[in-house]
């Protein structure tokens, strides 16, 4: 499901706006949960396997973030720099495993037929963007610019559907305040947003 597809424009988006208005009088935490649920549904439409892998990687990265944010960890055997390098290595290995190994195996299959059988399926673009977003988040935690704020917030920041599929790559410093200020948009904001969507779709025609 892409932004230009009818299921998104006439089913997913209207239902989300309706549910958003119903939840508007509640705690903002519920709006975060609603947006997370919508983002997970959107991600599942791109590929359930990639979404499950991404959620698992999000949990692992969040645990790395907790360790990096721990003030007492610098005195332990594996310092903060070592933790960061380990986290980056893990993310890069997973990213290469699912983004580049299929193409490499297809190329090598010209000489060896068994390789395509062993190769995993290629992951959608949402996986690549999310991995890069999480790497930037880990770097921000390492540099003490941000702190972990809960696994729900981390999952929402990573999978938020407006930018998870095609970018742009965002930093938590940019998105954190926006996630804190979730609210029901005014009519003029909705009209402006729909106008931008129509303009974007027109450019694709």
For each predicted feature, which ranges?
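Membrane-embedded transmembrane alpha-helical bundles that form the catalytic cores
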Residues: 1-205
